[in-house]
């Protein structure tokens, strides 16, 4: 497992390692496996992120943002109150909160299944990523 990812010995069976890769977009007409994210998160039987399990294992809910150049950024998957659905998911790399977060657009509604698409707001731009793997931890 990559540096910065949690130890898995004590995690519930619902935890998964999820790999997202950049889908087709302007500038990347074929998508790109070099741009993406690896998430460690609990999934319910509906393949959505399980917010209740997140509460009791929040430190284990991690994200690694990878790019073709530069170091990987390691952070946390954060669930915050607010938004139109009452709560939303963020990817936070600076736990002190000095840097801006990346928002997982409608992550609470997304099914993390191979072939599905999810959107992440990076700075002021929305990017779409394809779920390419979901593995038990």
Language-model regions: role of each:
Residues 57-103:
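Short beta-strand/loop turn elements enriched in aromatics
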Residues 1-60:
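N-terminal intrinsically disordered, low-complexity, charge/repeat-rich segments that act as generic
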Residues 45-48, 63-68, 114-116:
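Glycine-rich loops and low-complexity Gly/Arg-rich segments
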Residues 92-137:
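Short, compact, well-ordered microdomains
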Residues 2-9, 76-81, 134:
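Short amphipathic beta-strand and strand-loop transition segments with alternating hydrophobic
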Residues 21-23, 40-42, 67-69, 80, ...:
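A structural detector for beta-sheet-dominated domains
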Residues 16-18, 89, 127:
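Short beta-strand micro-motifs in enzyme catalytic cores
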Residues 14, 84-86, 112-116:
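A short, compositionally biased
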